[in-house]
Design a protein with these regions (language model features):
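C-terminal motif of bacterial Sec signal peptides marking the signal peptidase cleavage site
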Residues: 18-21
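N-terminal, intrinsically disordered, polar/charged segments of Gram-positive cell-envelope systems
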Residues: 26-121
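Core segments of small alpha/beta cavity-forming domains
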Residues: 93-163, 290, 297-301, 312-320
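N-terminal capping segments
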Residues: 102, 257-338
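Surface-exposed, charged secondary-structure patches
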Residues: 151-201
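...with weaker cross-activation on analogous glycine-rich loops/strands in unrelated enzymes
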Residues: 185, 333-405
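Short beta-strand edge/turn micro-motifs at domain boundaries
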Residues: 207-262, 403-406
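Low-complexity, Gly/Ser/Thr/Pro-rich intrinsically disordered linker/tail segments
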Residues: 404-409, 417-442
Length: 442
């Protein structure tokens, strides 16, 4: 094919030279008739794969018609030039949430992501088997962190003396704050209340206004996912995550505490001592249930100052008839003892108080508690949280196997003590107080 092109080209050149040599008046521009004829002949004998050559000739003819000078024919054919058409890069569509806006300010998709999280959480800890809904978390790291916490809670509940599978739960949400960081990122403050029916209990356990903070990010597929989560619920704020081993760094201590506590089951129960002014347990429990999800305006609330748990417990004791003394009292927000609002401070007071101030036992068998007594708890030591026993759970033989607790920060009612991640638990038995001995008065 290429030889035929060369032959045709040489023939045209010879014809042109012969005309010049003869001094003919029929001088011809190389870009006119003969070249056109030759070009058409080449096209007629060119396969489909060489059609670009015709396009190049058409371009040359357009240039000639426009008066653009063209070069004389070369002795060898020029290389074919391929014209490659390129399309402009298309811009990537921005992710967009097209779901309806709710009255609380969230979109339906954002709200559904939060409910998906809570459904996954309660189903997992309730079934003792982690199950995560699709597209819940924005990364593997946040999913591993969350599910490690869930697994720790399951491990704690599996070791309870009662059945802590959840047969039923029902939560409600209150959206407290929405902060839009960007069109694809939003921070949401949520307050959750939840009723739970544990398999081993005949009453509902209730949580009130548990504070959550969610960060949601909108992916390229227009799906919201959770990229961060914080919760007031225990154990989320005391849990220690070991990312290198994807494990709970405290789980060994947490489970060891349960073993030591359960070892007291069936142990000796001391007889309650007599006292001049017995503790009114019924009045104490009544007060606890009244203010478990509220704050008595006669006292300062310490929720934002480390927690209101011990302040609440002290109010319960006082409502049950325990008198305020020079080592334990609340007169005003500016005049009070640390032992009134601090777990560690109260433990020190209860341990050293004389019977005319407080008659109690801080070293009793764990399973000898009664309604109105305190359960203090933590992980390394029982000094992080204070709760009130509102009811006692007994087995078929009449022996205590668990307690139903009421507390502030978090606000819980009828919550089983054995469900807490705070497994280092101390019973403080409250008996009342005695009159001041005569020798002290003299």
């Amino acid at each position: 094919m290429r030889l035929r092109k060369i032959a045709a080209f040489l023939m045209a050149a010879l014809m042109a030279l012969s005309l010049l040599a003869c001094g003919s008046e029929n001088e011809t521009n190389p870009a006119t008739s003969n070249e056109t004829f030759i070009s058409e002949e080449i096209v007629e004998n060119t396969s489909a794969g060489e059609s670009e050559h015709k396009d190049k000739e058409d371009i040359d003819r357009s240039d000639s018609a426009a008066g653009v000078p063209t070069s004389a024919p070369a002795s060898e054919p020029q290389q074919e030039t391929k014209v490659i058409e390129t399309s402009k890069p298309q811009s990537k569509p921005m992710p967009k949430d097209t779901s309806a806006k709710r009255s609380d300010g969230l979109t339906e998709n954002q709200y559904s992501k939060i409910t998906d999280y809570l459904d996954s959480f309660y189903s997992s800890i309730g079934d003792f088997s982690v199950s995560v809904k699709p597209d819940l978390f924005a990364s593997d790291s946040i999913e591993k962190l969350e599910t490690t916490i869930w697994n720790s809670m399951i491990a704690v509940r599996e070791r309870s003396l009662i059945d802590l599978h959840i047969n039923y739960y029902n939560f409600s949400l209150r959206i407290a704050d929405i902060r839009t960081i960007s069109p694809s990122k939003v921070e949401i403050e949520v307050w959750e209340s939840c009723d739970q029916q544990y398999a081993g209990l005949s009453v509902l356990s209730r949580e009130f206004d548990i504070e959550h903070h969610f960060t949601l990010e909108l992916g390229d597929d227009s799906i919201w996912r959770i990229s961060n989560h914080k919760s007031e619920c225990n154990p989320f704020y005391v849990f220690k995550y070991d990312a290198s081993s994807n494990s709970d760094a405290k789980i060994g201590t947490v489970l060891s505490n349960i073993e030591m506590r359960n070892a007291q089951y069936g142990g000796e129960i001391k007889e309650e001592p007599a006292c001049d002014h017995p503790y009114n347990r019924a009045a104490a429990v009544e007060y606890a249930r009244q203010w478990v999800n509220g704050r008595n305006p006669n006292y300062k609330a310490y929720d934002a100052l480390g927690g209101n748990c011990m302040n609440f417990a002290s109010q319960v004791l006082h409502a049950g008839g325990i008198r305020q003394t020079d080592g334990w009292f609340f007169e005003s927000p500016k005049r009070f003892y640390r032992s009134w609002i601090n777990v560690d401070g109260f433990t020190a007071y209860a341990t050293s108080a004389s019977p005319d101030k407080l008659l109690c036992d801080v070293n009793a068998n764990y399973y000898s508690g009664q309604p109105g007594d305190l359960i203090l708890m933590g992980i390394d030591s029982p000094t992080n949280h204070a709760t009130i026993i509102c009811d006692v759970v007994k087995d078929g033989d009449g022996r205590t196997v668990d307690y139903l607790l009421c507390s502030n920060t978090s606000n819980l009612e009828n919550f089983p003590a054995s469900a807490y991640y705070y497994t280092n638990q101390r019973l403080v038995q409250i008996f009342g107080w005695n009159d001041v001995p005569a020798e002290k008065l003299s």
